[in-house]
Amino acid sequence: MKTRAQVFRVQFNNVLIRLDMLLNNEIDALWLTEPQATKARILGNPMLRDSRDFKVALGVLALRTAGVSDARRKAQLAAFVKGYNRACDSLNQRGLQAYADVIARRCKADKATLQALPKLYYSHIAPPRQQDIAAAAHAFKD
């Protein structure tokens, strides 16, 4: 859908700054990660779209071939993948509430936000799907 309104694509890498801008009416709409998206909803901001509805996985772990060419680097990568996948399993089995203290400390989330977090599923590291590659390529055509 096209709009006549003037739209600017800006990038703010700090999610806490993005949330503050929304809460202070300095920005009209933006993508938020959890737990910031939950905080925005609690404070009455409407959710226009939920990225989980898109059925696309755009998270990426990208490495240079030269960066994993020797045995030591391959072992480091294998250990990283194993640790990441175990963390996903733990989050999926125990839920975010089991890590509420870490989320509160690292993400500056309050108790109400922590209690309202949605049930999320975390995927293991896997090669990109063709549909995700196509979606990423399409996004950069604009």
Protein language model regions, located:
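Ligand-binding cleft/hinge of the Venus flytrap
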Residues: 1-11, 41-42, 100-103
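Short helix-initiation/N-cap motifs at beta->coil->alpha
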Residues: 3-24, 35
